C-alpha cells in the first residue's frame, strides 16, 4: 500500500515515519528533506521497512491514501493548488480553525473532497515521541467508519488507533486544546502552583466541551483521547509549541518575540482569535479563550492570568 504524506514539517515527517512501518510512503514538501529523513529512514530500514521517499506533487497523487499535515491557515490554498481527486481517500492531521473565514477544518476540506472520503486525526501525540517509536493512542474521526478503519490498520505497532465518528467534536477538541495549552504555559511560567493549574485545565475542558456542544460535538469525545487526552498532554509539556508560547508570555516577552524564538507554527495563537470571534457571534461563553485573546493583544500577563483564574 502506498501512502502520500503532504507536509514536510515535524508533524508530517513523524506521520511519514509512523505509516512507513507497514507501507510505502512518499512525502511531498517544498523544502529539501534529504537530511531530516536520513535518521528516520535508517530506523525504518533496520525494521525491514521501505525508506520514505520525497517526491513531487504529481508523483504523490498516484498514491492510494493521502495524509495531509499542512498548517490550517494555509490549508484552503493548498487544496486549491493540489487539485486532489474529489474521491481521494484523505486523512487530515491538521488541527486548528481558519481565521480568515472562521472555518473548521472539515468545512474547508468538504469544499474539495467528498465528505465520505474524509478522515480527521485527533488525540494526544508529539512528533518527537512518534519518531522515537514511543507508544500512543490516537483517534481517526470519520463518517465513513470503513475508511477510518482502513487508515487505522495502516498505523504502526506502537500506535493504537481508534475509529470514531463525531468529526466536529474531534476537530474542535484538537483546535481548542492548543488555546488552553498556551494558558497552561503561562500558568506554569508564573509558578502559580499545581492547584491553579488543575483549576485551569478542568475549567478549560468544560469550556472546550461547551463550545463544541454548540456545534453538535459529543461529550464523550471531549472526555476521551481527542479532548481530555490531547489537552492534558499539550498543556503540560515543553514539547508543545503552544505551551512554550505561554512560557514565553509569562516572561513578559512580546508575542512577536516569542513566536520568532519559537521558529515554528503554534496554531493556538490564531485559533484563539478565531474561537473568540465565533463565540461572540453565537453567544457562547468562553472566558479562558477570551482572556487569552486579550493577553495575546498585550494585556499584562499577571493581570490577565489573575482575571482568568477568577473568571474560570
From Swiss-Prot:
The keyword Signal does not apply. Its EC number is 1.1.1.94. NADPH binds at residues 11, 30-31, 95, 127, 241, 265, 267. It comes from the Bacteria. Pfam families: NAD_Gly3P_dh_C, NAD_Gly3P_dh_N. Keywords: Cytoplasm, Lipid biosynthesis, Lipid metabolism, NAD, NADP, Nucleotide-binding, Oxidoreductase, Phospholipid biosynthesis, Phospholipid metabolism. GO terms for cellular component: cytosol. It catalyses: sn-glycerol 3-phosphate + NAD(+) = dihydroxyacetone phosphate + NADH + H(+); sn-glycerol 3-phosphate + NADP(+) = dihydroxyacetone phosphate + NADPH + H(+). Pathway: Membrane lipid metabolism; glycerophospholipid metabolism. It is found in: Cytoplasm. Sn-glycerol 3-phosphate binds at residues 95, 123, 125, 177, 230, 240-242. One of its GO terms (molecular function) is glycerol-3-phosphate dehydrogenase [NAD(P)+] activity. It is an enzyme of class 1 (oxidoreductase). The active site is at residue 177. GO terms for biological process: carbohydrate metabolic process; glycerol-3-phosphate biosynthetic process; glycerol-3-phosphate catabolic process; glycerophospholipid metabolic process; phospholipid biosynthetic process. PANTHER family: GLYCEROL-3-PHOSPHATE DEHYDROGENASE (PTHR11728), GLYCEROL-3-PHOSPHATE DEHYDROGENASE [NAD(+)] 2, CHLOROPLASTIC (PTHR11728:SF1). Catalyzes the reduction of the glycolytic intermediate dihydroxyacetone phosphate (DHAP) to sn-glycerol 3-phosphate (G3P), the key precursor for phospholipid synthesis. HAMAP family: NAD_Glyc3P_dehydrog. Belongs to the NAD-dependent glycerol-3-phosphate dehydrogenase family. This is Glycerol-3-phosphate dehydrogenase [NAD(P)+]. The lineage of its organism: Bacteria, Pseudomonadati, Campylobacterota, Epsilonproteobacteria, Campylobacterales.
